[in-house]
Amino acid sequence: AASSFSSCLDEEPLYSQNNTVVFSSDSGAELALLGCYAYMTSTSAYGQHFQEIPVSGAGFSWSQRNGSDGIVSLQSLSSDGLISTTWNGMYKVISETNAFLENLDASGLSAETKNQFGGEAKFLRALAYYNLVSLWGDVPLKTVASTSEGISMPRTPKEQVLGQVVQDLNDALTIKETSDAGRINSWAVKAFLGKVYYKMVKLGINTNENLKNAKDMFDAVYNKHVYELEKNFADLFGDWVTTSKESIF
């Protein structure tokens, strides 16, 4: 007679790092969130290429293969390596935060955890979209995890994209303070929200209202005295420096 050993099999391979396992605990979800932070510090984002674009555009960089010529002459193409990798780098952050937020929302974690981790992820998504709008204007807007059907999307008007940025940042205002200097906090959210409002003023979007909004946010941060200038400017550039009282994020 045939024997069945189905009862001996693991139906849920708990050693496998799938979404169900990762988002079953605060520590697992936090590791996934730190992965989103890591993509923002990658070579194709703040780790190198995003920083190189304004430097190259100002004429302060040099490439043996004339790699910066297009940017310096303000005639860069989408095929330029620095341009394409920066675009892809920011959308990688967006893709990962979209997936993170969907899995976090579907998890059984506490409302407090969802608010904290979700707020941090939304800040990262907002930052990525702000950078994209600053460089390219109208860009595709995606707030859900990527699927094969959604790979190719038309550009979304920058006004709508910035509206999503403001919404994400407002959602992030309620996050708690953290002792980790590399993590976002509510004061950094307010500072950046003020910057976004002022960007909208410069673009002619609800000028009077957004000018007041920007001032309110900047005043709140300034009056709290959370940040201040370094007494010695050179201290910002030492190879031992990992953070600074000037650093907002």
Which residues does each predicted region cover?
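Acidic, glycine-rich segments characteristic of secretory precursors and extracytoplasmic regions
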Residues: 4-54, 89, 99, 159, ...
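Aromatic-residue-lined binding/catalytic grooves and analogous aromatic/hydrophobic interfacial grooves
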Residues: 8-13, 45-74, 98-102, 134-140, ...
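Short linear capping/connector segments at secondary-structure termini
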Residues: 17-19, 75-78, 143-150
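Conserved beta-strand positions that form and line the central face of beta-propeller blades
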Residues: 22, 140, 152
